[in-house]
Amino acid sequence: MVKISVSRFGSKHNPHYRIVVTDVRRKRDGAYIEKIGYYDPRKTTPDWLKVDVERARYWLSVGAQPTDTARRLLRQAGVFRQEAREGA
């Protein structure tokens, strides 16, 4: 099974996260299939959250399950907005 999750990188006391598509059997910071975005929790830049919405929707359409944190970030990026309108 494939999941969409966050993978930590950056330095000590300065976390940054990649939003990645990975196999559920991989470690949090292990190898991933595709990087679809990034997140800066300290909001040090104007683009503190960036997600490739098209690729995120693709992976969701083929069955990737987002983790709770990834789901929250994808929702903030607007990944679920268009899907809700199309289904209505």
Swiss-Prot record:
Keyword Transcription: no
InterPro entries per record: Ribosomal_bS16, Ribosomal_bS16_dom_sf
Domain of life, per lineage: Bacteria
Any one biological process term the GO annotation gives: translation
Keyword hit for Electron transport: no
Residues that span the membrane, as ranges: none
Gene Ontology molecular function, alphabetical: structural constituent of ribosome
Any one Gene Ontology cellular component term annotated for this protein: small ribosomal subunit
Keyword terms, alphabetized: Ribonucleoprotein, Ribosomal protein
Protein family: Belongs to the bacterial ribosomal protein bS16 family.
Protein's name according to its UniProt entry: Small ribosomal subunit protein bS16
